[in-house]
């Protein structure tokens, strides 16, 4: 199998790393379009030989032209546009340096191979690799590591120069004092001054050399601080910011965030280098106190250099204090950032500067809405107190990887009650599930004479008082983290921004893929788009308001889109997870599409879809049959809800479902799961096998056992549309009488089912129904 095809089948955590490999330098779209050709070329050889690189690059442009022609024939305007843009970019950037693109592609292919090896090793071990995310290093990260190595080398070089200048200064100081004492003695004895003048000239030469070396060191220090500033900006403004954004995405069901260990190593390395430089700057002060002169560069520049390195170190320490694990209730691990009052929640903070001397030295304090103060009262938000163990000392022993961290496991929130029942302002415009609160972590660092105040915040949390508020609270968390990377915008919902369908579709798919093994397909998402936006051809870029997503009722329904979808998600997780993971549930499909795909199938073909009218979440099956005149009929059963699925699994309902005609003959209308999977093959393994054990008499002296029973779902119907079903009817030996008249099954071709407790003789009990 081609390498690219193998990569597409990897778990989500590996696909996230695959995405990080590609950038504008080598777009993933190009990798997708030309996968077989790209894998057939020797890019490593091209990266080392310019003539071959030029040939491969021109062949690449030719392959792009051929692919463009194919898209032209398919009238695929979007792909045509993207491919033309990619070709223009490649020509402008790599036409004069084809070895560079060869090196980039070779590196990507090599990293892909490593990723596949890591995934394969994890599969053989029956679990995830130790750190699968650590296997991929992007080109940008390679450059960052190179910059860090350069910084460390410059620090070492500077230390050597400092030793040289110290030795030179000691020589100068010794010679100067010796000459001074000799000069004093010569004046007393009246000796010749020519020797003294000669030694003075030597001292002047030494002082000139000392001054030049000092100026070189000052210049090197300034240059090194600039390099450190660049690396630090890359670490904090790019790498750490990217990690925080990925953490946001992971919180709302997106791909799992990568490990912090690599970032910790980088930041710790930079912090160590900064402290070394600070010691060198202090050493300059000592040298200045021993020897100084007019125009001394140390006097002029040392204070500014020291101020600069201290500021860099302070900022690095502040940025390195992060929330590694966001607030989450242990009973709801898939819905972090929603906290119920009175229920314990956990979170974890970490300092990415791993200095052993800081172990057990930093005491962390937790508070909520620290910066809000009276502002919260003005906007009507509730106020809370944090109960439980709200202080903890950071240490390296509790973490498996030895990181300097503190985990809070026993925190709870209690609302501060006001005179009007809890809310500071009864005129508040936001409902409680739109209120955002910040949990703050504070500590102080004392290190090498510096005192640094550290503070970090959780992502905004929603606090609920009843679990029934969870769906709307989770919708708020989704909307916030989907649309902003501002970690402190607690007023977000006073004027919530508009999202696009592309953003919403991705997040909706995550709600399934994060808790099951399957996300949503393009067709399923299109059906959801139609529910939200109405009929359309292309929903890409269409705007969706917060109110439409969560607050307004859908057309013709008494509930919002999100309430409906969230209940379906709950239905999937609790009742039909295995069937969803198998891909047996089509789920979201319009009735028009449903009719179109079933009408061409043989009678007995059925599909499973979610109910559009059930607020609490329901699932139904629709099948095709032919009436007595040969006309195709599409029938749907009344949706099954959570309450019904509590008593009987959906697989057993499908396997045992029957239609009863006017002559009391039972027929199974469900034969093939769309497109052509035999019902028994799909659902048989999820049904409980009937006991074959010998039944003992239940009454003393009795020789006959009780009859076994089995629950089945039956739809009574007076029509004769079931005559052409491929499954032959079977008359049961014993059948209970209907309780009342049959339900109306004619409205909307939707059948209502009745559940029967069927008595079976010992003979028929062992045979399938």
From Swiss-Prot:
GO terms for biological process: cell surface receptor signaling pathway via JAK-STAT; defense response; eating behavior; eye photoreceptor cell differentiation; glucose homeostasis; growth hormone receptor signaling pathway via JAK-STAT; interleukin-6-mediated signaling pathway; leptin-mediated signaling pathway. It comes from the Eukaryota. Its main location: cytoplasm. Keywords: Activator, Cytoplasm, Developmental protein, DNA-binding, Nucleus, Phosphoprotein, SH2 domain, Transcription, Transcription regulation. One of its GO terms (molecular function) is protein homodimerization activity. Changing residue 728 to E: Induces t/bra expression. A motif (Essential for nuclear import) lies at residues 150-162. Changing residue 706 to F: Inhibits t/bra expression and mesoderm induction. SMART domains: STAT_int (SM00964). Residues 580-670 form the SH2 domain. The modification Phosphoserine is found at residue 728. It is found in: Cytoplasm; Nucleus. Phosphorylation of both tyrosine and serine residues, together with dimerization, is required for mesoderm induction. Transcription factor that binds to target promoter sequences and activates transcription upon il6st/gp130 stimulation. Mediates ventralization of embryos, at least in part via inhibition of smad2 signaling. Required for hairy2 to induce dll1/delta1 and promote neural crest cell proliferation and differentiation. Involved in TGFbeta-mediated mesoderm induction in early embryos, acting downstream of map3k7/tak1 and nlk.2. This is Signal transducer and activator of transcription 3.1. It comes from Xenopus laevis (African clawed frog).
């Amino acid at each position: 199998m081609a390498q690219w095809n193998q990569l597409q089948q990897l778990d989500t955590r590996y696909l996230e790393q695959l995405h990080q490999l590609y950038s504008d330098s080598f777009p993933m779209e190009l990798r997708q379009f030309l996968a077989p050709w790209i894998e057939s070329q020797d890019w490593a050889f091209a990266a080392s030989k310019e003539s071959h690189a030029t040939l491969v690059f021109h062949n690449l442009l030719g392959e792009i032209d051929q692919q463009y022609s194919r898209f032209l024939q398919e009238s695929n305007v979007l792909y045509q546009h993207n491919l033309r843009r990619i070709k223009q970019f490649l020509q402008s950037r790599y036409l004069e340096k084809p070895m560079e693109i060869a090196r980039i592609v070779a590196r990507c292919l090599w990293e892909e191979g490593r990723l596949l090896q890591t995934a394969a090793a994890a599969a053989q071990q029956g679990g995830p690799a130790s750190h699968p995310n650590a296997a991929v290093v992007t080109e940008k990260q390679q450059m960052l590591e190179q910059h860090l190595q350069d910084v460390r080398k410059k620090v070492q070089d500077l230390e050597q120069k400092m030793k040289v200048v110290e030795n030179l200064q000691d020589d100068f100081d010794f010679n100067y004092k010796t000459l001074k004492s000799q000069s004093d003695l010569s004046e007393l004895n009246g000796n010749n001054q020519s020797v003294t003048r000669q030694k003075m000239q030597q001292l002047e030469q030494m002082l000139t050399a000392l001054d030049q070396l000092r100026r070189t060191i000052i210049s090197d220090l300034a240059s090194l601080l600039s390099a450190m500033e660049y690396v630090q900006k890359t670490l904090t403004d790019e790498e750490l910011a990217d990690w925080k954004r990925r953490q946001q995405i992971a919180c709302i069901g997106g791909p799992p965030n990568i490990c912090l260990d690599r970032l910790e190593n980088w930041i710790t390395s930079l912090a160590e280098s900064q402290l070394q430089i600070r010691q060198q700057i202090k050493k300059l002060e000592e040298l200045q106190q021993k020897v100084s002169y007019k125009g001394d560069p140390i006097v002029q520049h040392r204070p500014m250099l020291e101020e600069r390195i201290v500021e860099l170190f302070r900022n690095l320490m502040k940025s390195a204090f992060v929330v590694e694990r966001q607030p989450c209730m242990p009973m709801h691990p898939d819905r972090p950032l929603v906290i119920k009052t009175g229920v314990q929640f956990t979170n974890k903070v970490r300092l990415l500067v791993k200095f052993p001397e800081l172990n057990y030295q930093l005491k962390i304090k937790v508070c909520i809405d620290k910066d809000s103060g009276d502002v919260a009262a003005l906007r009507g938000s509730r106020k809370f107190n944090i109960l439980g163990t709200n202080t903890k000392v950071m240490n390296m022993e509790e973490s498996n990887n030895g990181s300097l961290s503190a985990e809070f496991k026993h925190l709870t929130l209690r609302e501060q009650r006001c005179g009007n029942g809890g809310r500071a302002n009864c005129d508040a415009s936001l409902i409680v599930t739109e209120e955002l609160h910040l949990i703050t972590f504070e500590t102080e660092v004392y290190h090498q004479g510096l005192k640094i105040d550290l503070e970090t915040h959780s992502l905004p949390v929603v606090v609920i008082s009843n679990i029934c508020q969870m769906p709307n609270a989770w919708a708020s968390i989704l909307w916030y983290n989907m649309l902003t990377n501002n970690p402190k915008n607690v007023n977000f919902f006073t004027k919530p921004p508009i999202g696009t369908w592309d953003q919403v579709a991705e997040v909706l798919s995550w709600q399934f893929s994060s808790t099951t093994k399957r996300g949503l397909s393009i067709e399923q998402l299109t059906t959801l788009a139609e529910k939200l936006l109405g009929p359309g051809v292309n929903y890409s870029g269409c705007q969706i308001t917060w109110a439409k997503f969560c607050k307004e009722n859908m057309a013709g329904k008494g509930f919002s889109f999100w309430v409906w979808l969230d209940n379906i998600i709950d239905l999937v997780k609790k009742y039909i997870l295995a069937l969803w993971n198998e891909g047996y549930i089509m789920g979201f499909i319009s009735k028009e599409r449903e009719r179109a795909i079933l009408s061409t199938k043989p009678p007995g073909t059925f599909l499973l879809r979610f109910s559009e009218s059930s607020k609490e979440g329901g699932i139904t099956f629709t099948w095709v049959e032919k009436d007595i005149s040969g006309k195709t009929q599409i029938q749907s059963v009344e949706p099954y809800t959570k309450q019904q699925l509590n008593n009987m699994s959906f697989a057993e309902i499908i396997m045992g479902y029957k239609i009863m005609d006017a002559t009391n003959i039972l027929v199974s209308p469900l034969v093939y799961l769309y497109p052509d999977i035999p019902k028994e093959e799909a659902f048989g393994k999820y049904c409980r096998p009937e006991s074959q054990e010998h039944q003992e008499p239940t009454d003393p002296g009795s020789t006959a056992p009780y009859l076994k029973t089995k629950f089945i779902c039956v739809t009574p119907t007076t029509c004769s549309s079931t005559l052409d079903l491929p499954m032959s009817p079977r008359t049961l030996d014993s059948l209970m009488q209907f309780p009342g008249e049959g339900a109306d099954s004619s409205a909307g071709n939707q059948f209502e089912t009745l559940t029967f407790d069927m008595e079976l003789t010992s003979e028929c009990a062992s045979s399938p129904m």
